[in-house]
């Protein structure tokens, strides 16, 4: 115990963890990492805490800190250092590297993924994790595959609808052209016909004028001739009665 106290007096205690990074820097760095990378950082932090082990008292903690070399760092300090926000240049390089990586799926993996896609286009996290274990892929790869597969499905659906609507419009136009009768062309009227004045249906019978200037109809002529004959017969009889007879 005396040797431990002497060692603690000679060696200064190890410096504590530095101040936490600014919230703005952390928010900018989180955009450069995927969900799987953040999960890996949490696993590293948990492993560092398990490696440090439980501490029974403050005295033993001070002794352990005194025994460590000055250039090293304890297991408890490894987690904050790993969790610090990296520089923007490093995050950008890692993001570009992740974009270049392309996963090649074999036939069995594609068959399993397509079978699940037929059941649901939006699998939840549990389904994705279960499927990732079955096909020996990461959950992030499975999620990206489903996103690309949904985009492809929407493109194929839009193309199919466009083709179907175009064929329906084409067939409808052909049927309408066959069933619709040919409209007659409008005939142009001659200038002579247009020069005739408009008249009523009874305009063929000329109106009666007392002056007798208009021609009479056959019935009227017959009646006039009969009346004139009677008048002449009457005049003849009167004239015959007035002439004296010579004995």
Swiss-Prot record:
Q: Which domain of life is it from?
A: Eukaryota
Q: Where is the composition biased (Basic residues)?
A: 91-102
Q: Which residues lie in Pro residues bias regions?
A: 12-23
Q: Name one GO molecular function term.
A: RNA polymerase II transcription regulatory region sequence-specific DNA binding
Q: Tell me which Pfam families the record gives.
A: Homeodomain (PF00046), OAR (PF03826)
According to the record, the signal peptide region is none
**Cited InterPro entries:** HD, Homeobox_CS, Homeodomain-like_sf, OAR_dom, PRRX1/2
GO biological process annotations for this chain's record? artery morphogenesis; cartilage development; embryonic cranial skeleton morphogenesis; embryonic limb morphogenesis; embryonic skeletal system morphogenesis; inner ear morphogenesis; mesenchymal cell proliferation; middle ear morphogenesis
Question: Where, by tissue, is this protein expressed?
Answer: In the embryo, expressed in craniofacial mesenchyme, limb, heart, somites and sclerotomes. Absent from central and peripheral nervous systems, splanchnopleure and ectodermal derivatives.
Family per UniProt? Belongs to the paired homeobox family.
Q: Where do the segments described as Disordered lie? A: 1-31, 49-107
| Keyword terms | Developmental protein, DNA-binding, Homeobox, Nucleus
This chain belongs to which protein, by name? Paired mesoderm homeobox protein 2
Q: Output compositional bias ranges, type Low complexity.
A: 1-11, 49-59
Q: What is its main location?
A: nucleus
Q: Which residues bind DNA?
A: 98-157
Q: Name one GO cellular component term.
A: nucleus
Instruction: Give the UniProt subcellular location, in the record's own words.
Output: Nucleus
Annotated motif OAR: location in the chain? 224-237
């Amino acid at each position: 115990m005396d040797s431990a106290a002497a060692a603690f007096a000679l060696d200064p205690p190890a410096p504590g963890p530095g101040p936490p990074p600014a919230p703005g820097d952390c928010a900018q760095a989180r955009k450069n990492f995927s969900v799987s990378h953040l999960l890996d950082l949490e696993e590293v932090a948990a492993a560092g805490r398990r490696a440090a082990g439980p501490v029974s008292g403050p005295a033993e903690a001070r002794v352990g800190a005194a025994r460590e070399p000055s250039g090293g760092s304890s297991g408890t300090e490894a987690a904050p250092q790993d969790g610090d926000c990296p520089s923007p240049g490093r995050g950008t390089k890692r993001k570009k590297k992740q974009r270049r990586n392309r996963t090649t799926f074999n036939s069995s993996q594609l068959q399993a993924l397509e079978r699940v896609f037929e059941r649901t286009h939006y699998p939840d996290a549990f389904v994705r994790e279960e499927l990732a274990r079955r096909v020996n892929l990461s959950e992030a790869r499975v999620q990206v595959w489903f996103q690309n597969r949904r985009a492809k499905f929407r493109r194929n659906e839009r193309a199919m609808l466009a083709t179907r609507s175009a064929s329906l419009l084409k067939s409808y136009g052909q049927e309408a052209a066959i069933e619709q009768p040919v409209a007659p062309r409008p005939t142009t009227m001659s200038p002579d016909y247009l020069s005739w004045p408009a008249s009523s249906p009874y305009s063929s019978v000329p109106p009666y004028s007392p002056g007798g200037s208009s021609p009479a109809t056959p019935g009227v002529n017959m009646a006039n001739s009969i009346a004139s004959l009677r008048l002449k017969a009457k005049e003849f009889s009167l004239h015959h009665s007035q002439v004296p007879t010579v004995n």
